[in-house]
Amino acid sequence: APEIDKIHSIGDSRLSGLKKIKQIRPDIKTMYIKPTPIQFAKTVVEYADFSVHTSFTAIKAISAAAVAQKKQHKIIIMIELGELREGIMRENLIEFYNNVFELPNIEIVGLGTNLGCMYGIEPTYDKMIQLSLYKQLIEARFNKKLDLISGGSSITLPLIKKQFPKSVNHFRIGESIFMGVSPLDGKKFESLSIDAFEYSATIIELEEKESIPDGVISDANVGHTSDEVHDADDFSKSFKAILDFGSIDVDHTELIPKDKSIEFIGTTSDMTVYELGTNKKPNGQPKYKIGQKVRFTPSYMAVARLMNSKYIEKNII
């Protein structure tokens, strides 16, 4: 597709995703964007042109697989800059690079870091300068050019228009492209849509029921309910709709109903209940019926889970 020709590569943390990309567009460069499990080294080399690494043992496995497949595999070494997710310790970089440099069929093309994904450490100018300095250190010490300095994910994008090191030239972008906003400040990007995804669930039961359950409540329940359920009037009733999704499919907290008048009541493994109030339109007609869809705006995490589920139907419009 022409619209994806001006990017460096397509990254995925799922090898099944990279395999599908190569089947559709063998010419597209692909990147495996998490450290490689050793047992999957052969598959990584087969379907990824690039991969990110923090383990010398894993890179040796990648090297052996690349030799066997007669391929030159490109890698980015990830450095720990405070997020405490993937990344080698900074003081070990020179020795690590030197060891990897000796491996056959491995080309070190860059350095990278992960920020903002677990603890939420911001990719500040100071952090990016540190990453740039490690590039300079490696290039001076080994007389080898590093083409890619991967400065993080979507959270880094708002900083580009501010003071930003020019040497940081690669970003692993997902959330901003798909959701149209920055995870750093929640602001919308001018040229991107914030409505690219919608999730809809079907009403499989619709009944007027009491607001609180009747009977002895034990600790054996496996569901999750709204705190407001326990504060409701003992005698009040309202219409409850059971929708055909549960916690196995997606976390309800990652879904925002497009109809602001409905409220979450509870969820179990495969069904979720919402309160519809009187379920009346201004003209007195029922607002919702059995079989009707209830529509939601999903968060990035909801989209990721739903798109990776083989049980969820996907429609591209």
Annotate each predicted stretch with a short phrase.
Residues 129-317:
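Active-site anion/phosphate-binding pocket segments in diverse small-molecule metabolic enzymes
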Residues 1-133, 141-142:
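Active-site-proximal beta-alpha core segment in soluble small-molecule metabolic enzymes
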